[in-house]
Each structure stands twice: as structure tokens, then as C-alpha cells.
């Protein structure tokens, strides 16, 4: 069988809607399209290109039925010359055309993926190179040619081996022409390929050998292109240089060569550029400048390596020129190494520390030798060489490049202008820091025990000043200026005396010059000082006291923008001018906020050494974010002023927040963080809460910042003081699935684990909470779903309260999370580990949670006592939530191939297997109430309401109008209900009685409420209720699921048309095959093979009814005009319990028949007489609970016709043609239904039966048109 695919065929500017036929050769169809478009050329030259995919259609996609090669459905296929013919045509034009640019433009218009591959294979590069090497090629022509060569270079079939060296020479010679950007782009492609780089370097070296001065290529690109005003040229040029440095075999030497052309000073003048792409290239060049230092720091010192030995000899010969080198000697200790053998001290920084010491000794020998000439006392020993290695470590961490991934292409690290001053800028910074270190060591009169304090103080000052300086001289002067300011600030803090203490003052040489007595005032404030400036808030807490007097201290904080911050403590006045009648001293201290930074310097030392120290004009932020740093610490009695200064204050605020913490809390952008803060210094620092910047970012920052931190050298396994890891905070927030998955991957990459399972169950060491339970606590359904997607198997980890994830979700009453957890393996039977509470105890028997926890064991009492406002659980919205027991019925008759019915034996010994006994079958013995308009009916009896009424009746009631109900119960529990309605609406109620023979008579009316449509959910079971086997559901079984075979239900119905006076039988799609019955003069096409079908369809005979009545108690039926509802006869089972069910229907002349599993009949049945069809104002509705359409059959209007029993000929209708059509439709439908049953019964003759079924349905459709 052939299939067609709808496509749009395009040729030049024309397009047609056509089909591609599968199974037909593509060449044949292309020939047809060429004829449609009137193409004169040979069709074999043409191909069909799928425009969206950029691929050509092949026979593979045409002939293979299930081919997944390409999807061309509804796509545009362009009819064009095949790739081979296109290339041949273009090459022919390039060879013959004298206009080189025109031929190149033609070539550029064909540069598709397939064309480029074919162009390279056919030697097209030779033609292109010939144009480039041509002397007559203009600059514009070369620009187009270089652009085409750049495009071709990205395809796999391309190799730089195909390109000759003269072409590369032509490319290099055009680097200096600013308007020829393609030459620079082509140079970048060359520099990123090993073969291309070699050819590029050969061309540059060749030019360097033959030219001098400004004609040199490096001079052109450094002094010409980088100094130009075209930002694109600058970016491309610097990109080329960076690529050449990266692929160079000796990058350090290559950079030295570039420095001879003053590239650093040229770039330094361009640092103010704002273009992101250009600034990124500047940052990459800075990384190349410091890569020597980074590489040396990662190269461990090896005393057995000759090159390393020579470096150590260089240091010895510089410091001790008159002595023979010795690897182990006490001179090494004299200059500051820890041991006689210095090799062990280089373990931290490798060769970088050694090279810096060599540079210092060679260029600033006087600084190196001063500690040796002026030897400090043993207590003040200055480990000069060791401090030099520590300074090297600081510089490496300070300037170390950050990791920039493809996801952060716009992220640029910190650019230090001072590094672009000269080639040795970094070495000179090192020398300045060593000088400052010595100054601080002397001023502090430091000992070896506080070495780390001195180092932290110096490194804090350097990290603050370094990004702001443009040259080494400025760097040195600014640091010295800050040191002097701190000395002045300390001196200005001294106040009048209340208590005295003695302190020793040391001179510069460390000797005691004098002993002085200093009088200080104890001033400690408890006043909280809150500030609002650039989004930061800090507080100052302390107590105000003095020894002799009660002092009122007023503090006024003013800023340049006019804002005022005041601190008010106990018994304090906030007025600047205070009159104290009690002669109390009032101290008014004005503090100025300059540039949003607070300086608080009103603290003095007391005899006990409780001091408040404030510092950091930078506000603890390199970026100048305006955060306020006020540090409160307990310091020891100092010998000099500078020792009282807390070292951490220059970088850390009182709450322990580093500048990186402050930037995160102030919601700074990633660009501001990377540009304004040296993140390498603070990545793993913790504040007073134990939060690292990553942990803090996972709590409040956007995903981009978290992603960036995870790609740096941060440790994601440092917990906070509350035990939460960064991943806990990460899971407590909402992310997209892609963000969450990538974040988990980055966390996983930094751990030793290899599965998501270990990260998901990472435990808080304080509360024992996992990230999953943290997400549940915060109600974050998205994160819970993501976690379960990554790790579906949930282990029942218990927290410190004994709860697992499911317990927490239940306590939070989050139905969605509870469902997700159970679906992913959470066990509802596990109790609380400590309190032993079960899940049901935790949910307090909440019905909705109980259904989720245990849908199959929900008790009927819980269901019946639920609120009336609760959602009705029916088959559509709570399938399987309540266990429903069907009424016991005989098994389904089995179908044989000869269309005969064989009834299977029932579980009862008195099974009814003949036609007469089938009249006793309980077809509609118990009618369940159903409300078509979704109303809540609270009835103990089954009521059908189609008029939007809510009924609360405990008897047989008619809800619509004023009806009188007389309930008469006879000894056989048969009640006759006479209902009088003002609208002449009568309800016929037949009580179906089940008689049993076990001598058990019940005087109560038992109700079976097994239908899912029972609105009040009452559930009263019969004492002797046997379930029908699931493989053979009864007719009145309340649920027919999709798994139930069609052949297992037996429901039929009655249908008549306005043109036929006699009702005829029509079967439902689930009825067994019919057998023809010729008992009457006229054949009626109905299922008349059993008394059961006769009973249901109203074709009763006197003999069957008499036999049926003999086996039961008297079943009386009364009928009247108007609307009616009917119940079928009772069945005689082996029980002696009488069950009375009353069905009342009153619908304002609406005839409603409710039968479970069967189509209702549209008239009243008098079991001893004929059948009454409803009055001519009756609307017949059939409500059924079977697998067929749950709705009403079309309404047919009767004519008050009375039918005759079986055997009496039906009166012919007036319109014979329509009547015949009706009969034919019934016959065809019966045949169709029988064929359906045969098809479902087995595979025998299935194709033949399907064919017959199609023919029967087509014939039926033709007859319906005659209606």
C-alpha cells in the first residue's frame, strides 16, 4: 500500500502544494516536478533540498516505511540543481569570469553544508587561492575571498594542508589594514589550529626578517590596530594575540617579544573601554601575563632537579657572593628560612617563592640585607624569607584567574591596571609588600607568635589598595598613607584620665626609651546604631559605663547626602548640646559618613583591656558597596598604638561578613562582584553564622551567581553553624529543572560521590535533615519534584525528631508532595522513630490524605461520615479509592462459533439455565440512584432527580411537587407506593424481593448502596452478600472498567421510532449474539433466544410469567399515566432475606429509567398484561452505568400505542419505506453487535468478521438516511 506525504515544492520564485509518494523512486518524482515547472534541463541533475533541515531528500526516506531519517511532512522542498552540478557550474564560472569579485559573490551565495563539502572535494580551494594570490585582486576582492576561506575552514573536510604558504603570507600582509577585518578573523582561525599556527608564525617570522621598524607585523598590529578607534579591529587584534600566546611553545618568551613593542602600555590606555568583548580580551591578556607566576607556583621545588638547583645557587651567590654554595647551611636560617635546608620551605609556593626571592635579592638587595645587619633580638626574630614566600602566596591568590565557562561568556574577572605598567610590575608589587611587611613588623614590635596577624593586616591593606592603583609608585604611597592615617586615628582616640595604666613605648630599634602613664576613659556603648546606606544595615552593641560619673553620651552620624544616624543608649540624650543639671559629662561625638562609609573612633582602652576598635574606611568592601564595618573585640594591653588595631577589621565586619558576603547581601550583580572584589581571597571564608559566600548565595542569590561560585575553588561541604550545607539552602528555593539539574551536577563534581543519591541524602549534622526534607519543610514542590526525578528511590532518613520525608509532608498537609513521595517509594507504614506515631496518626485521619496513603483500605465508615461538601468520589475522579462489591449474579453466557449460547453454571446449586428461568434474572432488581445534574441527594432510598433538587428524605419521596406517599408493607416485604402528583405525575415502584431458603427472615429493608453515583455515600451491606467473581461481573455491577471484556456484559434496550407503532428491541454493544425467533406471524429482529431478553424487552408470554410467579412471593406492579419508572421482576436465589428497594422518580412528565449495566425501557410494564408505552408528553431518558456512552438516547415521542404479546403481528406503519428502514437498521445493528462479540471471543475468522462488520455498518448508514 502506498502512502503520500504532503509537502510544498519550491522552484525559484514559484511554489506548489504537492505530495511525495512513498515507494516511488525519487528520480521519477523529480522528473514529474521538472515537467510541472517546465524545466528544460535533464531532471537527473536536480535534487530536492529540505530547507528547514538543510539536507537533500534521498531514496532512503522514500522507500523505507518506518524510516526516521528525516521528517518532511508539510515542509518546503526546494527543487534545485544537485550539489555536484552546482559546484561544477560555479567552478566553470570562476575559471572563465574575468570579474573576480563577481565570481566570488556567486560562490558565496552557494555556501551550504553540502556545497562546501563537494566544493572542497572537487578542488575548489585551488581556484579560490588563485584569486587570492592574483596581483590584480583589489582590497575588496581579498576581503570577500578571506571571508569565504574563513567559512570553508570550519567544515570537517577542510585542512590547512590544502592552503599554500603564499596565501598565508598574503593574509599576514593585510593584518595592518584596519578596513580588512576578514584577514584578522582568518588569522584567528589560523592561530587556533596547530598546522595553521605554524604557517602563521612562519609568515610573521619571514616578515620580521625582511622588514625593520614600523613595517614589522607586530608593530602594525600593536601600535596600529590596538591604537585604532575601531573597537572591532581592537577586539579582533587582541583576540589574535591571545590565541598566538596560547598556542606558542614558549609563551613567556613570546610575551617578552611583545613587550618590546610596548603592548602593555598600549593596552593600559585602553582600560577605560566599556565594550564587553574587548574587556574580556584584555582580561585574558592579563591572565597570560601572570601565567608564569601561576605555573611556577604549581611547580614543586625538587632538589634533585638541576634547573631548580641552579636557581637556589643564584640566590646564594647574590646574598653570599664570597662563600661557596652549600645546600644545607646556617646562612639559610639567618635570612629567614626555618631550617638549614631551605627546600622544605618552598613546598607551598614551589618555584614562584624562590624566583621572587631571587628578584628581590638582585634588584633590592639593601632591603634584603637590612634584617641581617640590624639583627633583632631573639624574641623579635623576623623570618624574612618565610614572609617572602607568604607574600608570594597572597599575590597568587589575589591575581589568580577565575574560571570562565561558556555559560558565563560575559563574566570578566578583576582587571588590575598596575599589572599593565611594565613587564616586571608583579615583581615590583612583591618588593613593595615586603617593605611594608618589615615596617609593620617593626612598628608592632612583633614576635614570631603573631606572624599570621601581621601578615593578615598587610594582605588586607594590599587587597584593598591593589585594584585602585595604576602604577607601583601609587601602590606604595597609598599603603604608607593608610598606615599613617591609622597611627593618627589611634592617637586621637586617647581621652582624659579616669583610670591609669602604664605602658612601655618602644623605639624603632626595639629598646625601651621611657615609661609613661596614660589616662583613659572607659567607654563601651550598648547603643544599637543602625544605618541605612546603599542597602546595608549594621549595628553597634555594647554597654556605656564609667568608674566615677554618670555620663550621657550623644552620638550623631551625618553623611554627605544629609542623612543622619543617631545612637541612643540607656539614660542617653541624642541632642548635640546637652545641659546636665547633675553635672554629668556630655560627650558629643560627631561621626561623618564620607562616601557612605562610617568611621567610628571614640573608643578608649581601660585597665581591663575591654576595647572597641573600629576601622576600615573601605567599609569592608573592596568594591565600595557602602557597607559599614564596626568591629568589637577584646584586645590585650598594647605596648604601642598599632597593636590595638584588630587585623581582621580591614576586611571583615563585626558579623564576620567579608566583602564577598556583603556584596551578596546587597544583591550586587555578578559583573560587579567579579570586577570589584578579589573573590579568591574570600571564597571559603565564613561569617559569624558559619555561612560561606556559596552557602549565603544559595539562600538569597540568583542562580547565575551560584553557578559561578560552584565553578571556582569553593568548598560546598563547609556547613553553617546550624548544620546546613549549601545544597540544603539550594534545595529550599524554586529553580527551573535545567537550573536544578546543572546545579546538582556542579555540586556532584566537587564531591567524592558519584551518584545523585548521596547528595540528595546529605545530612544536616545538627537537625539530621536532608536536602529533600528541607525542600518539603519550605513547601517547595518544584525542588521536591526535581530531587525525586534525579533520585527516585527515597531512603527513609530520620531527622532529630524521628520524622522522615513522608512524615514532614503529612504534617505540612501537602497532598502533592505526599503523592510524589509515595509514587517514588516512600513507605506509609513506617512510624515516627521516636514517638512511634504512624502516618495515619500524623494526618489525624484526614480523608484526603488517608485516600492517598491507603486508597484500597479506606473504611466505609470514613466514607459515609465525610462532610457533604466533600467531593463525591465516583468512578471518574477516584477510580479504585473505595472498594465496591457487586451484587451476585449468574455468570455471563459463553459464545460459541455456531452462534449458540451456553450458560455457565452459577455458584448456586439452583442455577437458572433455561429460557423460562431467565425470566427470574434480576436485570434491574436494585436501581441505584443517579443525579444527572450533579446534585447531592441524601436519601436512604434510591431517588432519581433530574430537576436540580436536593432531597433529604428517609422514605419514598417525590421531590418535585406535592406528592402523597402511602407506604404499605405486607408480610412479604412488598410495598406498593401510590404517589399522587398535582401535575398528574405517577411513579410506579416495584419492590424486588430476594427470597432465600435458609430460614433466615429479615424484617428489615436492607439497602445495597454499591453504586459510585450514590451521593450520600451510605453503605449498608446485606448480611449474606456474596460477591460476583471479578471475571464475571453481574449486570448490575456498579463499575464497568476498561479491563472488562465486552462479551461479559448483557444489557439490552428498547427503541422505537416516531414512524413505528410497535417498540422493537435493540441491543447494546456488549450484548451476546442474537438468535432469530419465529414464534409470531412476523419476524421481529430482537434477541429472543432466552426468556431473559424477552423479559427485558417487554415481550412476555403468559406461560413464562405464570411460571415465574410460582417461584416468588407476589410481586405487584401498579402503573398509571404520565411519567413512570419501572423495576424488573425479582429473582429467586438461595437466600431468605427480603430486601426492599424503592425507586421514586418524578420529573415533570419525564420518563426516567435507571438500570445499572443496561439500557432502560421507555414504558411501564404490567407483568400480567400488555406493555404500556409512555404518554405522548413523555420524554424517554435512559440512564445506565455500562461501558457504553453515559448519556441519554435520543428522545422519541410515542402515540399511546399498546403492544401485543409475542406471537401477535405488529401493525404495519403508514410509511412502509421508513418502517422497513427501521427494521433493517435494527437487524444490521444486531448483526454488527454479534460480529463484535465474535471478534472479541477469539481470533478465528477475525479478518472475515471485521470485513462483515464494516459492510453491515455501511448498510446501516444507508438505511438511516431514509429516516
Curated annotation (Swiss-Prot):
GO terms for cellular component: plasma membrane. It comes from the Eukaryota. Keywords: ANK repeat, Repeat. Residues 507-598, 859-870, 895-908, 924-1033, 1108-1176, 1184-1213 have a biased composition (Low complexity). ANK repeats lie at residues 655-685, 689-718, 767-796, 801-830. Residues 486-598, 854-908, 924-1040, 1057-1082, 1103-1215 are annotated as: Disordered. Residues 1057-1080 have a biased composition (Polar residues). GO terms for biological process: actin filament organization; cell motility. Residues 307-466 form the ELMO domain. Pfam families: Ank_2 (PF12796), ELMO_ARM (PF11841), ELMO_CED12 (PF04727). Residues 486-496 have a biased composition (Basic and acidic residues). This is Ankyrin repeat and ELMO domain-containing protein D. The lineage of its organism: Eukaryota, Amoebozoa, Evosea, Eumycetozoa, Dictyostelia.
Amino acid at each position: 500500500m502506498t502512502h503520500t506525504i504532503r509537502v510544498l515544492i519550491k522552484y525559484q520564485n514559484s511554489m506548489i502544494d504537492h505530495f511525495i509518494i512513498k515507494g516511488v523512486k525519487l528520480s521519477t518524482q523529480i522528473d514529474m516536478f521538472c515537467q510541472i515547472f517546465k524545466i528544460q534541463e535533464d531532471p537527473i541533475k536536480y535534487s530536492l533540498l529540505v530547507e528547514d533541515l538543510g539536507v537533500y531528500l534521498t531514496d532512503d526516506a522514500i522507500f523505507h516505511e518506518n524510516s526516521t531519517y528525516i521528517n518532511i511532512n508539510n515542509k518546503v522542498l526546494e527543487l534545485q540543481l544537485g550539489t555536484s552540478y552546482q559546484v561544477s557550474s560555479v567552478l566553470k564560472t570562476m575559471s572563465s569570469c574575468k570579474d573576480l569579485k563577481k565570481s566570488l559573490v556567486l560562490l558565496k551565495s552557494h555556501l551550504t553544508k553540502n556545497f562546501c563539502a563537494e566544493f572542497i572535494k572537487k578542488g575548489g580551494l585551488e581556484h579560490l587561492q588563485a584569486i587570492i594570490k592574483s596581483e590584480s585582486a583589489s582590497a575588496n576582492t581579498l576581503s570577500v575571498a578571506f571571508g569565504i576561506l574563513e567559512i570553508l575552514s570550519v567544515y570537517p573536510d577542510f585542512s590547512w594542508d590544502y592552503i599554500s604558504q603564499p596565501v598565508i603570507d598574503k593574509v599576514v600582509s593585510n593584518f595592518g589594514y584596519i578596513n580588512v577585518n576578514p584577514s584578522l578573523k582568518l588569522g584567528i582561525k589560523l592561530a587556533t589550529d596547530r598546522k595553521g599556527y605554524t604557517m602563521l608564525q612562519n609568515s610573521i617570522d619571514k616578515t620580521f626578517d625582511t622588514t625593520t621598524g614600523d613595517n614589522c607585523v607586530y608593530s602594525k598590529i600593536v601600535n596600529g590596530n590596538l591604537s585604532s578607534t575601531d573597537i572591532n579591529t581592537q577586539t579582533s587584534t587582541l583576540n589574535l594575540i591571545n590565541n598566538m600566546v596560547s598556542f606558542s611553545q614558549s609563551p613567556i618568551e613570546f610575551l617578552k617579544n611583545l613587550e618590546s613593542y610596548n603592548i602593555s602600555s598600549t593596552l593600559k590606555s585602553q582600560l577605560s573601554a566599556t565594550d564587553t568583548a574587548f574587556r574580556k580580551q584584555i582580561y585574558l591578556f592579563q591572565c597570560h601575563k601572570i601565567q608564569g607566576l601561576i605555573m611556577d607556583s604549581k611547580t614543586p621545588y625538587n632538589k634533585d632537579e638541576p634547573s631548580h638547583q641552579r636557581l637556589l645557587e643564584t640566590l646564594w651567590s647574590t646574598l653570599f657572593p664570597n662563600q661557596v654554595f652549600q645546600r644545607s647551611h646556617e646562612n639559610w636560617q639567618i635570612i629567614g628560612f626555618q631550617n638549614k635546608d631551605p627546600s622544605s620551605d618552598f613546598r607551598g609556593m614551589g618555584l614562584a617563592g624562590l624566583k621572587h626571592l631571587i628578584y628581590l635579592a638582585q634588584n633590592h638587595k639593601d632591603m634584603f640585607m637590612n634584617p641581617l645587619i640590624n639583627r633583632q633580638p631573639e624574641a623579635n626574630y623576623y623570618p624574612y624569607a618565610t614572609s617572602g614566600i607568604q607574600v608570594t602566596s597572597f599575590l597568587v591568590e589575589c591575581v589568580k584567574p577565575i574560571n570562565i565557562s561558556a555559560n558565563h561568556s560575559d563574566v570578566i574577572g578583576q582587571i588590575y591596571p598596575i599589572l599593565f605598567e611594565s613587564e616586571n610590575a608583579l615583581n615590583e608589587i612583591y618588593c613593595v609588600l615586603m617593605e611594608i611587611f618589615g615596617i609593620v613588623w617593626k612598628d608592632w614590635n612583633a614576635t614570631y607568635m603573631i606572624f599570621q596577624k601581621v601578615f593578615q593586616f598587610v594582605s588586607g591593606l594590599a587587597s584593598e589598595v591593589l585594584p585602585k592603583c595604576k602604577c607601583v609608585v601609587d601602590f606604595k604611597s597609598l599603603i604608607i598613607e593608610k598606615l599613617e592615617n591609622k597611627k593618627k586615628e589611634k592617637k586621637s582616640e586617647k581621652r582624659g584620665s579616669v583610670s591609669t595604666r602604664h605602658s612601655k613605648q618602644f623605639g624603632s630599634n626595639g629598646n625601651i626609651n621611657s615609661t609613661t602613664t596614660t589616662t583613659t576613659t572607659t567607654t563601651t556603648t550598648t547603643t544599637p546604631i543602625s544605618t541605612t546606606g546603599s542597602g546595608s544595615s549594621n549595628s553597634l552593641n555594647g554597654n556605656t559605663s564609667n568608674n566615677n560619673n554618670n555620663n550621657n553620651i550623644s552620638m550623631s552620624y551625618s553623611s554627605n547626602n544629609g542623612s543622619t544616624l543617631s545612637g541612643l543608649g540607656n539614660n542617653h540624650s541624642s541632642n548635640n548640646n546637652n545641659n546636665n543639671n547633675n553635672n554629668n559629662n556630655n560627650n558629643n561625638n560627631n561621626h561623618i559618613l564620607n562616601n557612605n562609609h562610617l568611621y567610628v573612633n571614640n573608643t578608649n582602652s581601660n585597665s581591663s583591656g575591654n576595647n572597641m576598635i573600629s576601622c576600615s574606611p573601605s567599609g569592608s568592601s573592596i568594591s565600595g558597596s557602602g557597607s559599614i564595618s564596626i568591629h568589637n573585640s577584646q584586645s590585650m594591653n598594647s605596648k604601642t598604638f598599632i597593636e590595638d588595631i584588630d587585623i581582621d577589621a580591614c576586611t571583615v565586619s563585626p558579623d564576620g561578613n567579608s566583602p564577598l558576603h556583603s556584596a551578596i547581601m546587597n544583591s550586587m550583580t555578578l559583573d560587579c562582584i567579579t570586577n570589584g572584589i578579589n573573590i579568591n581571597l574570600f571564597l571559603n571564608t565564613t561569617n559569624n553564622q558559619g555561612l560561606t559566600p556559596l552557602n549565603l548565595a544559595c539562600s538569597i542569590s540568583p542562580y547565575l551567581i551560584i553557578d559561578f561560585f560552584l565553578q571556582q575553588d569553593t568548598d560546598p561541604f563547609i556547613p553553617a553553624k546550624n548544620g546546613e550545607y549549601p545544597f540544603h539552602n539550594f534545595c529550599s528555593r524554586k529553580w527551573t529543572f535545567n537550573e536544578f539539574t546543572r546545579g546538582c551536577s556542579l555540586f556532584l563534581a566537587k564531591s567524592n560521590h558519584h551518584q545523585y543519591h548521596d547528595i540528595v541524602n546529605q545530612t544536616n549534622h545538627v537537625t539530621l535533615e536532608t536536602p529533600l526534607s528541607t525542600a518539603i519543610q519550605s513547601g517547595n514542590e518544584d525542588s521536591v519534584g526535581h530531587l525525586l526525578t534525579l533520585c527516585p528511590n527515597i531512603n527513609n532518613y530520620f531527622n532529630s525528631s524521628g520524622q522522615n520525608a513522608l512524615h514532614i509532608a503529612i504534617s505540612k498537609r501537602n497532598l502533592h508532595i505526599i503523592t510524589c513521595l509515595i509514587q517514588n517509594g516512600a513507605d506509609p507504614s513506617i512510624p515516627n522513630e521516636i514517638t512511634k506515631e504512624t502516618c495515619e496518626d500524623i494526618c489525624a485521619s484526614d480523608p484526603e490524605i488517608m485516600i492517598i496513603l491507603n486508597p484500597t483500605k479506606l473504611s466505609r465508615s470514613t466514607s459515609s461520615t465525610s462532610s457533604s461538601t466533600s467531593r463525591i468520589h465516583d468512578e471518574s475522579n477516584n477510580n479504585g479509592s473505595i472498594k465496591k462489591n457487586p451484587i451476585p449474579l449468574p455468570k455471563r453466557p459463553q459464545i460459541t462459533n455456531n452462534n449458540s449460547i451456553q450458560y455457565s453454571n452459577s455458584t448456586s446449586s439452583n442455577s437458572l439455565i433455561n429460557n423460562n428461568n431467565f425470566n427470574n434474572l434480576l436485570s434491574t432488581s436494585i436501581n441505584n440512584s443517579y443525579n444527572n445534574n450533579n446534585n447531592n441527594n441524601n436519601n436512604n432510598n434510591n431517588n432519581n432527580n433530574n430537576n436540580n433538587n436536593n432531597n433529604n428524605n428517609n422514605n419514598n419521596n417525590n421531590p418535585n411537587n406535592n406528592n402523597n406517599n402511602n407506604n404499605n408493607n405486607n408480610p412479604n416485604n412488598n410495598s406498593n407506593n401510590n404517589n399522587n402528583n398535582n401535575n398528574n405525575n405517577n411513579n410506579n415502584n416495584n419492590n424486588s424481593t430476594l427470597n432465600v431458603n435458609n430460614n433466615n427472615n429479615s424484617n428489615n429493608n436492607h439497602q445495597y448502596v454499591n453504586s459510585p453515583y450514590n451521593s450520600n455515600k451510605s453503605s449498608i451491606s446485606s448480611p449474606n452478600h456474596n460477591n460476583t467473581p471479578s471475571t464475571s461481573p453481574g449486570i448490575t455491577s456498579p463499575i464497568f472498567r476498561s479491563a472488562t471484556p465486552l462479551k461479559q456484559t448483557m444489557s439490552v434496550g428498547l427503541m422505537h421510532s416516531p414512524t413505528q407503532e410497535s417498540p422493537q428491541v435493540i441491543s447494546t454493544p456488549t450484548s451476546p449474539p442474537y438468535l432469530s425467533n419465529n414464534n409470531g406471524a412476523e419476524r421481529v429482529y430482537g434477541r429472543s433466544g432466552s426468556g431473559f431478553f424477552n423479559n427485558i424487552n417487554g415481550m412476555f408470554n403468559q406461560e413464562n410469567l405464570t411460571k415465574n410467579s410460582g417461584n416468588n412471593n407476589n410481586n405487584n406492579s401498579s402503573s398509571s399515566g404520565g411519567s413512570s419508572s419501572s423495576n424488573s421482576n425479582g429473582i429467586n436465589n438461595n437466600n431468605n432475606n427480603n430486601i426492599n428497594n424503592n425507586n421514586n422518580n418524578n420529573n415533570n412528565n419525564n420518563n426516567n429509567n435507571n438500570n445499572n449495566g443496561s439500557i432502560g425501557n421507555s414504558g411501564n410494564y404490567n407483568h400480567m398484561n400488555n406493555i404500556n408505552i409512555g404518554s405522548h408528553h413523555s420524554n424517554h431518558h435512559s440512564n445506565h452505568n455500562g461501558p457504553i456512552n453515559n448519556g441519554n438516547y435520543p428522545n422519541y415521542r410515542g402515540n399511546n400505542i399498546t403492544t401485543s404479546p409475542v406471537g401477535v403481528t405488529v401493525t404495519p406503519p403508514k410509511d412502509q419505506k421508513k418502517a422497513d428502514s427501521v427494521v433493517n437498521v435494527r437487524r444490521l445493528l444486531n448483526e454488527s453487535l454479534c460480529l463484535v462479540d465474535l471478534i472479541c471471543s477469539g481470533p478465528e475468522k477475525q479478518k472475515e468478521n471485521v470485513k462483515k462488520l464494516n459492510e453491515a455498518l455501511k448498510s446501516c448508514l444507508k438505511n438511516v438516511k431514509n429516516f
